[in-house]
Amino acid sequence: MRLWKSMAWGILLWHSQSGALCPAWPPARAAEEIARLQQQLADWNDIYWKQGVSAVDDSVYDQLSARLVQWQRCVGQDVSSTPVSPPLNGTTMHPVAHTGVRKLADRQAVEQWMRGRSELWVQPKVDGVAVTLLYQNGKLARAISRGNGLQGEDWTPKIRLIPSIPQSTQGALANAVLQGEIFLQREGHIQQRMGGMNARSKVAGMLMRQDNASALNSLGIFIWAWPDGPANMPERLSQLAKAGFSLTKKYSLVVKDASEVERARQSWLTSALPFVTDGVVIRMAKEPASQYWRPGQGDWLAAWKYPPVAQVAQVSAIQFSVGKSGKITVVASLVPVILDDKRVQRVNIGSVKRWEAWDIAPGDQILVSLAGQGIPRLDEVVWRSRERSKPVPPDSHFNSLTCFYASETCQEQFISRLVWLGSRSALGLDGMGEASWRALHQTHRFEHIFSWLALTSAQIANTPGFAKGKSEQIWRQFNLARRQPFTRWIMAMDIPLTQAALQASGDRSWEQLLMRTEQHWRQLPATGERRAGRVIDWRDNPQIKTLSRWLAAQHIPGFGS
């Protein structure tokens, strides 16, 4: 299918500022869009932490939060008020602040971060809810939600009901502060295959609701920090394991370089684990004294997250394509995103009716994933822009019998027909893609789909953008096409039959084909009454008849008398 000539580009043009893509909005609109997204995130955040209900997928929330920060930076706005962390409802102070973790974009960033750092370990980045556990005199004295990193809610009553969390400790852990992740226990969870399952939201919901004590049995704990604990990492891990926090030791590995980090990351992505993960965390064994820990200042650890299974992408334009059969398809052009190492910059929405039902306009944020064979797929619209500037689709008068001849309204279906006849299913013109057909048609103004047969080698060579080797190849392909059998030319004319049915018919000339009745076509493989009728309509179409006479004049096999 080819893109409609008068495709409607959206109002979002993009430029680079400090390495980020920024919408070219007027100041008033920028302020409005930022305020709307900020309020939506705040509402979702409030529902998530107060009611334990996720109104949106965790990954979508994270990506939209990052998009908000990007927009705010584009306009020079303070990002401190961005609601990416829980609202501060609790007032219980953490004995040691939660620093958070810096995110590294790729292996190169990992290599750079590791340079100059020593005694490094890697752990899975368990996807759950962060908590502080305070042990005093060998007993669990308090459990505090992460909150803003300095203070949070007192979760002690709920945490006491989680069987997997030790209620008493000994030795160095008798009086200790631990930081970790409360997670949903899984059996044989393979992250690459099963995804995130909204695990973080499920854990938050269990901890927030008041009527589900039994559900807490399914929660576990992964300790990732023991502030002021043993300086020796193996000793630290050993003591945690003896106290009942065994997962930390089991899933902590010494790493010397980015290659070892990458191997661990890939292994945990594809192996069966007892929890959901969203990447890995690299940390130095040597940490500063806890009195120096501050939110956002943990430079001794960093995370390398897994690429999301689905990406939030910005719609930059809505385009319409018309296939050779006349079907109109809507395509969304996107600000490019990367999915599984694939650069995605457009996604097929489907029919005009489906597009209207989706209500997608330039400026909207949509969730895109990869379907079978790596084809981009639209999953949902996650955010709609305030401004709803939609293009008008082309008239729907196209069908399987239109646009064999070029006209102003037929440009896209005409190009689609050229692409089809050059494909391996028809004449097999190697090297003739859409761009080549467009260049030839724009230069030489084809009258119909076979006008290229009349081109001379000089005309092809004088086509803008064609190098000498390219033009010579096209000339050879066009000459070879003249030797193709009759059935190939009929396929190029888009007869509504499969190749198998056409071969079974035994027709080797236009004269034979004209003599066939509808009853004959019905008896062919995969050809019923409806398709047989379409063959008759195709054969009797005036444009098809004219094309058959033109091919006869060109001495194409099967069309002469």
UniProtKB/Swiss-Prot annotation:
This is DNA ligase B. Catalyzes the formation of phosphodiester linkages between 5'-phosphoryl and 3'-hydroxyl groups in double-stranded DNA using NAD as a coenzyme and as the energy source for the reaction. One of its GO terms (molecular function) is DNA ligase (NAD+) activity. The keyword DNA damage applies. It catalyses: NAD(+) + (deoxyribonucleotide)n-3'-hydroxyl + 5'-phospho-(deoxyribonucleotide)m = (deoxyribonucleotide)n+m + AMP + beta-nicotinamide D-nucleotide. Belongs to the NAD-dependent DNA ligase family. LigB subfamily. It is an enzyme of class 6 (ligase). InterPro entries: DNA_ligase_AS, DNA_ligase_B, DNA_ligase_CS, DNAligase_adenylation, DNAligase_N, NA-bd_OB-fold, NAD_dep_DNA_ligaseB, NAD_DNA_ligase_OB. One of its GO terms (biological process) is DNA replication. SUPFAM superfamilies: DNA ligase/mRNA capping enzyme, catalytic domain, Nucleic acid-binding proteins, RuvA domain 2-like. The gene is ligB. The active site is at K125 (n6-amp-lysine intermediate). HAMAP family: DNA_ligase_B. Its EC number is 6.5.1.2. The keyword Secreted does not apply. Keywords: DNA damage, DNA repair, DNA replication, Ligase, NAD.
